């Protein structure tokens, strides 16, 4: 009887030990492996890691333009968005994310981000009949005429010289203009910043939306206010030794 109990106990112990050897020694269990960064194809982690810091966790509320704005997505098609994500915007805070441009994202990952942004936040038909200005400028702008356009459409919020007003922030600030490309300025003029209370091209003057050329001209005026070396408020005399 004791021998039988001994054999049963030994058999149970053997089964327990063998069950822990179902995989080769040192090999991680299935499902426990850490996913390589270039294999992540879920929008959530890709957006959180690469986009949310500037554009906001839910596509709005960040320092950069809201991606969850249907008007913006109505003027910037997938091709334009993908180009910006992949190649960035030189001279601004928007970096290139494609591996062939020095970034960390694969072509598939960029596809996931651009496709999902449009799928989640666009609203098909939102600009039907609106005749919005084109996403990219069709011709050169006239800065002198742009100053007139600014006075008509922008001054009431941003102040006479663009240094801030009762409703809007400074948009001729040296550092601001240094961080914004002409295309970014154009996009904001057209799409607005609804999360900040800034209207799109239709809302500055009721019943009188901005024309394509007026948008182009006011961007030319803003661009003409850029300075070569922003962020250097001290004159050379400050550094003269006495």
Where are the regions a protein language model picked out?
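Bacterial N-terminal signal peptides that target proteins for export
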Residues: 1-11
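C-terminal motif of bacterial Sec signal peptides marking the signal peptidase cleavage site
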Residues: 17-20
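Disulfide-rich extracellular modules and peptides
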Residues: 23, 53-56, 69, 115, ...
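Flexible coil segments in periplasmic/lumen-exposed cytochrome c-class electron-transfer proteins
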Residues: 24-33, 37-41, 45-48, 95-161, ...
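Gly/Gly-Pro-rich "capping" loops immediately C-terminal to redox-active cysteine motifs
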Residues: 40, 44, 56, 60-86, ...
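Disulfide-stabilized extracellular ectodomain repeats and their linkers
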Residues: 48-51, 64, 91, 151, ...
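Short alpha-helix boundary/capping elements
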Residues: 89-90, 121, 193
């Amino acid at each position: 009887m004791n021998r039988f109990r001994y054999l049963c106990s030994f058999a149970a112990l053997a089964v327990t030990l063998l069950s822990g050897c179902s995989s080769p020694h040192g090999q991680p269990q299935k499902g426990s492996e850490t996913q390589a960064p270039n294999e992540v194809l879920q929008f959530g982690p890709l957006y959180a890691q690469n986009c949310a810091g500037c554009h906001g966790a839910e596509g709005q509320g960040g320092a950069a333009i809201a991606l969850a704005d249907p008007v913006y997505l109505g003027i910037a098609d997938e091709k334009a968005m993908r180009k910006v994500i992949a190649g960035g915007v030189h001279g601004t805070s928007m970096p290139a994310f494609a591996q062939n441009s020095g970034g960390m994202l694969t072509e598939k990952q960029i596809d996931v981000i651009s496709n999902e942004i449009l799928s989640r936040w666009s609203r098909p038909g939102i600009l039907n009949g609106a005749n919005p200005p084109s996403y990219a400028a069709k011709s050169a702008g006239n800065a002198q005429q742009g100053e007139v356009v600014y006075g008509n459409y922008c001054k009431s919020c941003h102040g006479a010289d663009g240094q801030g007003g009762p409703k809007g922030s400074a948009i001729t600030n040296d550092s601001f203009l240094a961080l914004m490309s002409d295309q970014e300025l154009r996009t904001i003029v057209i799409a607005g910043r609804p999360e900040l209370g800034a209207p799109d091209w239709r809302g500055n003057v009721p019943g009188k939306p901005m024309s394509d050329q007026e948008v182009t001209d006011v961007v030319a005026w803003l661009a003409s206010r850029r300075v070569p070396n922003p962020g250097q408020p001290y004159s050379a005399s400050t550094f003269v030794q006495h």
